[in-house]
Amino acid sequence: MREMLNNIGAYGEWAAGLVPDPPRLSYRKPGWASLNAWKAQARQRYLDALLRPESGGTPRATVQHHIEFDGLAIEHLSWQLPYGPPTEAIVLKPAGASGKLPAVLALHDHGGNKYFGTRKITRISQDVHPAMAAHQERFYGGVAWANELARRGYVVLVTDAFSFGSRRVRAGDLSDPVRRGLTEQNPEASDEIQRYNAWAEAHEHVLSKSLFCAGTTWPGVFVGEDQRALDYLCSRPDVDATRVGCGGLSGGGLRTVYLSGADPRIRCSCAAGMLTTWRDFLLNKAYTHTWMVYIPGLPRDLDYPEILGLNVPNAAMVLNNHEDQLFTVPEMERGTNMLTEIYRNAGAPERFQGKFYPGLHKFDRTMQADAFAWFDKWLRA
């Protein structure tokens, strides 16, 4: 009998069969002494698999400039991690706000565009790069969602992720065989940005393999960096560190899943356009996704949605699109059902919500309204 068509042909069902369902450390399996006992063992396994490199303590941020725009007080920050170029970040909150506010770490997407980072989900002036105006129109309903959330009474922090924006790999630092003719002579020019992004896409496997050779993983790097951003956010005098969340679309949804699984300081999360199963990646959709996703060895112990489940009973929301070209609907549904079961088994069914919307891969205004209401429910109540 011929196997169903899949990413790796005749090897597909064999490979899928290597992963037990449920996996070895799943909370969907009976026999755990307590929720806390499961979380301690499963989270430690997850953290061990990430192989996070040392990323320092709470970053010492420098304010590059402070402006007010569209009713928001905005700080443009930078800080230096123990490696790589400085990280640029944006903080937004309502102008004139006082006291400690709830806060959200807003995580930008991948989107096949490594030239940009924070600018994908923020606006700090009327002068918006045409590529970012188009990006926000395509994926976010034409708005900068970090601004929209800040306007509701939050301190919102957005940082350039590892290999994006200020943290991107630069042509001048590369050996000739890897550079492949890449230059950065007119960095804001649209044609040069397109060339950079095409180069960066082709460079992903080199970067990922190099990180493996360094004894770490791509998720381990960005989770560590997002935890340092969380350290900074929680240290701010205008932030109530007991009311902090995170969220994002696509690559930002991936970062939401992984950060929430690693760090219980995340009291509420919303992952948009990034909830499926390892089986979906393995058999159907790995070719559509970045190397940022993969954590070697972990699927035998935890399915992808169960990483987010490690943060139970803290609140979690996942938002999916029925026509999302990056996933299959049955596996999005199966992943959502896994989280429903985990939260039910933990006695906190009301703290998880999974929703589906019509349309392609996106986090549009309707989805944003639901996400913002979710943050309000758990961080502002």
What spans do the regions from the language model cover?
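Proline/glycine-enriched tight loop/beta-turn segments at coil->beta junctions
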Residues: 84-87, 94-104, 110-113
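Short glycine-enriched nucleophile-adjacent loop
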Residues: 253-264
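Cap/lid segment of the alpha/beta-hydrolase catalytic domain
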Residues: 99, 107-224, 235, 281-285
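N-terminal targeting or regulatory segments adjacent to alpha/beta-hydrolase or S9 domains
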Residues: 1-73, 81, 117-118, 152, ...
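Conserved strand-to-loop "acid loop" that flanks and positions the catalytic carboxylate
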Residues: 312-327, 358
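Alpha/beta-hydrolase fold nucleophile elbow
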Residues: 238-250
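Mobile cap/lid helix-loop segments that gate and shape the active-site cleft of serine hydrolases
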Residues: 201-216, 220-229, 268-308, 313, ...
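C-terminal catalytic histidine-bearing segment of alpha/beta-hydrolase fold enzymes
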Residues: 291, 337-338, 342-381
